[in-house]
């Protein structure tokens, strides 16, 4: 009804606001018997967390997960899994001066128009704080996918402003606060972000996410297409303004002889389609990209109106990310994992009796 839940068989419902006492989620549809412990959530939650470097928001939350239900003696029971994280570092006073003002480029105005009431503290429900629980739910999905099917979901920052990676190394991604795949460029990113922060401005970014090991057959035509649901999932992340599957918009400049992924008994010779054809996985890596707009909460004055319709200049003094894309990689990974787990369970429910289909084409091969 009010779109706080996600998924069909494997569902996630989140609740809470940025400056409320807690945020949480209910994960339903997880098969029983999956081993899970509170400490397993820490890694991805800390990857998403702010306050880990000078290039993100200074807000520091412990993000300690509490498992309220659905787990007994360290294993899922098949019943709803309740997860809770208590907020501990709110500074609501930072928003007292703009409580009646609509920040340009922010959800303040649209929430006001929809509900006639809004929580101005940290953006309330529209804050990216909500994505903490998506990442928590994603921990469950990632683990189940890896154990059950060998699927590995991972992502990286593929553009910061106008800067693009000059090389690629997965090992470098987890060794810097940007999730950047080329270690030699990290000093350049730091210099760029230092100058941006001093200027009081913000910048956009792009994140790439992929899942390797996805079997052929996941996804439902026509309205439950894997790429359609993946695009919707990524678009639901705060500040995302565009999503591509595979080559995405670059496909407009390609010819059919270039874009089609030729098939051989040894495997596909390319993956322009992003591992999805007809809304169904091909067995190749599922690849997607998302673009995030620049943060709208700035220290630089901007023209707007207040709740009375009066013209004012708004200046945001709270703690905000100069680039929300820096922390978006684990969020994108979580959303892809949630979509894949839901699709896997739906495929198993409908097609579990379908035997091995020949020929079974391996994933992409080098040419």
Curated annotation (Swiss-Prot):
Pathway assigned to this chain's UniProt record: Metabolic intermediate biosynthesis; chorismate biosynthesis; chorismate from D-erythrose 4-phosphate and phosphoenolpyruvate: step 7/7
Entry's Gene Ontology cellular component terms: cytosol
Uppermost EC category: lyase
Record-listed FMN binding positions: 125-127, 238-239, 278, 293-297, 319
BP GO annotations: amino acid biosynthetic process; aromatic amino acid family biosynthetic process; chorismate biosynthetic process
Pfam families: Chorismate_synt
E.C. no: 4.2.3.5
Cofactors: FMNH2
Disordered, as annotated region: 39-60
Keyword S-adenosyl-L-methionine attached: no
Annotated residues for binding of NADP(+): 48, 54
Catalyzed chemical reaction(s): 5-O-(1-carboxyvinyl)-3-phosphoshikimate = chorismate + phosphate
Record keywords, A-Z: Amino-acid biosynthesis, Aromatic amino acid biosynthesis, FAD, Flavoprotein, FMN, Lyase, NADP
Single GO term (MF): chorismate synthase activity
Database matches in PANTHER family: CHORISMATE SYNTHASE (PTHR21085:SF0)
Family designation: Belongs to the chorismate synthase family.
Role this protein plays: This reaction introduces a second double bond into the aromatic ring system.
Quaternary structure note: Homotetramer.
Full protein name: Chorismate synthase
Organism whose genome encodes this protein: Xanthomonas oryzae pv. oryzae (strain KACC10331 / KXO85)
Taxonomic placement: Bacteria, Pseudomonadati, Pseudomonadota, Gammaproteobacteria, Lysobacterales
Gene: aroC
């Amino acid at each position: 009804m009010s779109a706080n839940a996600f998924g069909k068989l494997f569902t996630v419902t989140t609740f809470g606001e940025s400056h409320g006492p807690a945020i949480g989620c209910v994960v339903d549809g997880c098969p029983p018997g999956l081993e899970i412990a509170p400490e397993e959530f820490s890694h991805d939650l800390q990857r998403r967390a702010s306050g880990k470097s000078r290039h993100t928001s200074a807000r520091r939350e412990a993000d300690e997960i509490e498992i309220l239900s659905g787990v007994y003696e360290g294993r899922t029971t098949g019943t709803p899994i309740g997860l809770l994280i208590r907020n501990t570092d709110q500074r609501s006073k930072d928003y007292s001066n703009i409580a009646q003002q609509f920040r340009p480029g922010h959800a303040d105005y649209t929430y006001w128009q929809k509900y006639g009431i809004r929580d101005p503290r940290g953006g309330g429900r529209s804050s990216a704080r909500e994505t903490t629980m998506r990442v928590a739910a994603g921990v469950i999905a990632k683990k189940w996918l890896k154990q059950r099917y060998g699927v590995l979901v991972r992502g990286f920052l593929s553009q910061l402003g106008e800067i693009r990676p000059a090389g690629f190394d997965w090992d470098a991604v987890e060794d810097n606060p940007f999730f950047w795949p080329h270690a030699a460029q990290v000093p350049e990113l730091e210099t760029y972000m230092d100058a941006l922060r001093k200027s009081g401005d913000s910048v956009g970014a792009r994140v790439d996410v992929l899942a390797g090991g996805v079997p052929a057959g996941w996804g439902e035509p026509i309205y439950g297409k894997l790429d359609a649901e993946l695009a919707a999932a990524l678009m639901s992340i705060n500040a995302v303004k565009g999503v591509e599957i595979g080559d995405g918009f670059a496909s407009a400049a390609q010819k059919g002889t270039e874009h089609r992924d030729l098939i051989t008994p040894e495997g596909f010779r390319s993956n322009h389609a992003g591992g999805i054809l007809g809304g169904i996985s091909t067995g190749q890596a599922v690849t997607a990209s998302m673009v995030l707009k620049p943060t709208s909460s700035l220290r630089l004055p901007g023209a707007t109106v207040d709740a009375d319709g009066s013209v004012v200049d708004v200046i945001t003094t709270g703690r905000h990310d100069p680039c929300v894309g820096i922390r978006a990689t684990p969020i994108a990974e979580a959303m892809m994992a949630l979509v894949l787990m839901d699709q896997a369970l739906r495929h198993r429910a409908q097609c579990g009796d379908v035997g091995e289909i020949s020929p079974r084409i391996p994933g992409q091969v080098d040419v």
